[in-house]
Amino acid sequence: MKTFHTVAELRTALKIERLKDKKIVFVPTMGNLHDGHMSLIRKAKEEGDIIVSSIFVNPMQFSDQSDLERYPKTLEEDKRVLEANGCNYLFAPDALEMYPDGKRSQTQIEVVGISDILCGASRPGHFVGVSTVVTKLFNIVQPDTAIFGNKDFQQLKVIQDMVRDLSSNVRIIGVDTARNEDGLAMSSRNGYLTEEERRIAPTIYQTLLWAKEALLENRASHEDICEQAQQKLEAAGFRRDYFEIRAQENLQTPSEEEKRLVILTAAYLGKARLIDNLRVEL
């Protein structure tokens, strides 16, 4: 695996691969890699010839400077893991390479109607940062296909809508959430949990399963299911952010006729903000 830190070097290497008619698949990350990321790499290997990953902790998507500063940075270990799993190229730029004039002078991309709800409501500007950096990375890598996890379902929808709205020819593939044996979704933020919090954390997945069953059995209104779910999480020790039932297609409040739903939640446990979701087909 070759590692590049500048746009020019990566573009030169990938130009050679394209001249060989190789299909390029891209897996963007923020590092601190775990088995969930490796499931994306495995999917990428099924979809093309050349696997490119990136590691960049994007300051534009952090409204809390302290959260940015404490985000785990494990580049050398990440490089070993990526190489062992068949990644061909790693792009690991610094903030100056990505935002040479500073992030405040950076042109911004906002996907309207979906960026300021759910996680976007509690993290203002987050998805503008995501959309902007992913657009830049797509322009740098110019992949045929890009792979994202379904764990951050809203992020996936933002990127899908962005690609559609900007007439990009990158194919977006979502991969099912990778989970620990107890159901907790794999996440770099799980490392913020204490031993006791880690024991409690799977409650978030168990509550999603309960809500899915309640939906399928039509036990109560969406509002009542969400409120009961919030109470279950709070009883276990979580602090609420949101627990919502939305339409898969656009993440808006679903009509009574909507059959393809997604249950999404974000909740705080100690210093960690955990997110998860489950799709439901009625």
Curated annotation (Swiss-Prot):
It catalyses: (R)-pantoate + beta-alanine + ATP = (R)-pantothenate + AMP + diphosphate + H(+). Keywords: ATP-binding, Cytoplasm, Ligase, Nucleotide-binding, Pantothenate biosynthesis. It is an enzyme of class 6 (ligase). Pathway: Cofactor biosynthesis; (R)-pantothenate biosynthesis; (R)-pantothenate from (R)-pantoate and beta-alanine: step 1/1. The keyword Membrane does not apply. One of its GO terms (molecular function) is pantoate-beta-alanine ligase activity. GO terms for biological process: pantothenate biosynthetic process. Beta-alanine binds at Q61. It holds the Pfam family Pantoate_ligase. GO terms for cellular component: cytosol. The active site is at H37 (proton donor). (R)-pantoate binds at Q61, Q155. It is found in: Cytoplasm. Its EC number is 6.3.2.1. CDD domains: PanC (cd00560). Its main location: cytoplasm. The reaction proceeds by a bi uni uni bi ping pong mechanism. Catalyzes the condensation of pantoate with beta-alanine in an ATP-dependent reaction via a pantoyl-adenylate intermediate. Belongs to the pantothenate synthetase family. Homodimer. NCBIfam families: cyt_tran_rel (TIGR00125), panC (TIGR00018). This is Pantothenate synthetase. The gene is panC.
